[in-house]
Amino acid sequence: MGAFMTHCGWNSVLECVAAGLPMVSCPHFTEQFMNEKLVVDVLWVGVPVGVKGAAQWGVDAEGVLATRQDVERAVAAVMDYGEEGSARRARAAKLGRKAREAVVHGGSSFRNVALLIQHVQQRASTRNPWIEKKPSDCR
């Protein structure tokens, strides 16, 4: 697969990063526009379709949805094998390697999940006075 077209939901962005794929971004609403900024302007691994505003369900607002030409332009840009396209793919591949390294045994995400589990287990083993009280004692 050469690239992935995404609405820029957080899980899709993480999956693309982990797979080392460049993205064509087409956000619809909420945090997806912020995620698009991360993908396109910070990580430099995506090409925007050019959506200007949030979609309203049931309303086909002119200028909000991407046109065929917008999608075609973005796909052509992300699949370009010139200098910019090659650099984008190299950055995506590098991020993918870093993401995979983070989740292997001993990686940063592996360690952080282990620490979270340890913290939850420690908190669960300590006695919480609020849990021991009856509802009538809490007034």
Label for each model-derived stretch:
Residues M1-R139:
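Catalytic core of nucleotide-sugar-dependent glycosyltransferases
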